[in-house]
């Protein structure tokens, strides 16, 4: 029987797909409360995890079938960690097969996904239980430890001495959920950039639906997923699977935060809505490769849209996050526009803003894929999409190397046919 609200505090081993056992189902219109654990660095240095994240296991949604879509309304997000550590990575030679996020092994005894123990602090604190050698497949070339003051809304990076003190109490500062199995990266004790202040503006790097193929959770996107094509490890996929089965759940788009609406494709029965990889803050692009991963509590509300067969997520960000030309028309503006149109003898096209996600191995390929996806969704030529994006939208970088948001003012008559008009009108309080 479907539940009106589900608490999800259970995590994958780094792999997500049709094999992953789902919680639920949650009722159509119900809520999911996710207790998330940090993504990126903690899972990256944990030898037993088979992906670059440790996302929550998916939740089935009542009535969701392949070929439908699920509307995910992001209601709240609370940062739980007291500190975070991040930086630019460098893989350790010999500590992986093909992909250091996925196919980890001890660089000395060659044991795949070795059991481990943490001894002391520092970048070599994670040791293989079998032979005793340092076993993390990554080092942090330049990194920082940041203390977070959620009440005041900012964080400050600390010096090496304070970072070492935090490392000694890594579990306390990280506030990992009880069922998380990662090593908190705070044990590294990095303090290369002290005294830097940043505003806390949290969001989820992972929020979406389950892909139709079993893959590492961090690779459920068109950029990282590209590395799985014919890869030399058990999670290799074909180019056809790459193009067909991924759902772009790993966006790292900083507008996936409270007040946003994400509309995601259903590619397995029940949709399998999952979350993870919460960040305390991030500028467009996540140019360092990683940012301030934190444990968090997120609440979303879900609703099934029957027959809306999507290739990729559609994002309705908070209005203040929209680029200037994509912002919704307000009543006074619209009345003036109608008057001007009457003077010209024209009929105005009612429109609404939305963002189509583009993804690919490079940022240019991601943009082109975003245009193609928007073309298919809206039933217009790629050339028309490009013209509309140019004068009523924008292309924004979500993550390097290959996630973009293609903003466009889409004709309302088309959104009505898709079953999206009411959702967008209510979200942006449009004057139509």
Segments from the language model and where they lie:
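N-terminal, charged/glycine-rich beta-strand/loop interface patches
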Residues: 1-254, 265, 269, 329, ...
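Short gly/pro-enriched beta-turn/loop segments at secondary-structure junctions
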Residues: 249, 256-260, 293-297
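Redox cofactor-anchoring modules in respiratory/redox and cofactor-processing assemblies
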Residues: 239-240, 267-356
């Amino acid at each position: 029987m479907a539940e009106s609200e589900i608490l999800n505090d259970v995590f994958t081993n780094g792999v997500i797909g049709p094999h992953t056992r789902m919680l639920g189902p949650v009722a159509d219109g119900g809520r999911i409360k996710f207790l998330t654990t940090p993504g990126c660095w903690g899972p990256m240095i944990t030898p037993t995890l088979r992906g670059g994240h440790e996302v929550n296991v998916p939740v089935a949604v009542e009535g969701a079938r392949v070929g439908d879509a699920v509307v995910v309304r992001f209601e709240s997000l609370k940062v739980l960690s007291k500190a975070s550590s991040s930086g630019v990575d460098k893989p350790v030679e010999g500590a992986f097969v093909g992909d250091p996020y996925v196919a980890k092994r001890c660089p000395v005894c060659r044991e795949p996904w070795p059991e481990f123990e943490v001894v002391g602090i520092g970048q070599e604190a994670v040791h293989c239980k079998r032979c005793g050698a340092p076993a993390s497949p990554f080092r942090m070339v330049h990194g920082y430890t940041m203390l977070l003051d959620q009440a005041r809304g900012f964080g400050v990076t600390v010096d090496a001495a304070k970072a070492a003190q935090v490392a000694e109490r890594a579990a306390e500062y990280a506030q990992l959920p009880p069922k998380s199995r990662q090593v908190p990266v705070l044990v590294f004790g990095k303090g290369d950039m002290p005294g830097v202040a940043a505003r806390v503006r949290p969001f989820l790097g992972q929020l979406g639906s389950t892909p139709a193929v079993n893959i590492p959770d961090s690779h459920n996107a068109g950029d990282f997923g590209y590395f799985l094509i014919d890869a030399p490890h058990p999670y290799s996929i074909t180019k056809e699977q790459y193009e067909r089965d991924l759902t772009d759940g790993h966006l790292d788009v900083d507008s996936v935060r409270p007040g946003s609406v994400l509309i995601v494709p259903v590619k397995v029965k029940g949709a399998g809505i999952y979350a993870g990889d919460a960040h305390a803050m991030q500028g467009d692009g996540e140019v360092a490769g990683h940012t301030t991963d934190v444990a968090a509590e997120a609440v979303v509300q879900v609703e099934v849209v029957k027959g809306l067969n999507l290739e990729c997520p559609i994002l309705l960000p908070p209005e203040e996050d929209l680029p200037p030309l994509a912002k919704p028309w307000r009543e006074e503006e619209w009345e003036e526009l109608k008057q001007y149109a009457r003077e010209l003898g024209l009929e105005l096209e009612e429109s609404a803003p939305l963002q189509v996600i583009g993804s690919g191995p490079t940022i240019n390929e991601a943009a082109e894929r975003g245009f193609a996806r928007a073309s298919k969704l809206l039933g217009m030529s790629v050339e028309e999409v490009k013209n509309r994006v140019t004068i009523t939208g924008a292309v924004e970088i979500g993550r390097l190397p290959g996630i973009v948001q293609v903003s466009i003012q889409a004709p309302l008559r088309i959104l009505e046919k898709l079953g999206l008009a009411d959702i967008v009108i209510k979200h942006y309080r449009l004057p139509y």
